Amino acid sequence: MRITVSGLPGSGTTTVSKLLAEYYELELISSGEIFRRIAREKEMSLAEFGAMAEKDPSIDLAIDKNQREVIHSHEKLILESRLAGHMAKEVPNVLKIWIKAPLPVRVKRILRREKSVSFDEELERTVEREKSEALRYMNYYNIDIDDLSIYDIVIDSEKWNQYQILDILKVAIDSLVGPE
């Protein structure tokens, strides 16, 4: 079973991916975690590292190449990243999930996780980060991140908590592959 989980910052992709990976005993690879780790190692904020990635395509291209290799080579995997669904487009039998939430909800969640600035500052950072990423995705791959048509499931994490989302996704997954 191969599953991709994508969404904008603060939408809950990492949380839901971890729950799915635990429930189905799947390996979880999170490109967002990799990106954040590299930013920390370079002692840069996500916005600074994103700006650097805008100027140096090799950063995104290396991470994305790795995603394509991973989704092709693993049978039991959850790949969590903004572009995971796009990276798996040509791989058969991959369930592609997009998790969405309104910007203010996502900013509040990011603040709970990072606790570094005010709401307005984080709102500005998040909008800047999303613009940076959208520009890079369009420039590198001609991907419009707002086009959700490639996803099998789009779910709103403002309406349901992570456990309710897990329950919804279990019904969808089990109907496709049968219960594990």
Curated annotation (Swiss-Prot):
EC number: 2.7.4.25
Any matching Pfam family: Cytidylate_kin2
Superkingdom in the source lineage: Archaea
Family matches, as InterPro entries: Cyt_kin_arch, Cytidylate_kinase_dom, P-loop_NTPase
Record-level Gene Ontology MF annotations: ATP binding; CMP kinase activity; dCMP kinase activity
Gene3D superfamilies cross-referenced by the UniProt entry: P-loop containing nucleotide triphosphate hydrolases
Main location: cytoplasm
Catalysed reactions, as listed in the record: CMP + ATP = CDP + ADP; dCMP + ATP = dCDP + ADP
Positions with a binding annotation for ATP: G7, L8, P9, G10, S11, G12, T13, T14, T15
Keyword annotations from UniProtKB, A to Z: ATP-binding, Cytoplasm, Kinase, Nucleotide-binding, Transferase
Gene Ontology BP annotations: pyrimidine nucleotide metabolic process
Compartments, record wording: Cytoplasm
A cellular component term, taken from the record's GO annotations: cytoplasm
EC class of the enzyme, as a word: transferase
Family: Belongs to the cytidylate kinase family. Type 2 subfamily.
Protein name as annotated: Cytidylate kinase
Gene assigned in the entry: cmk
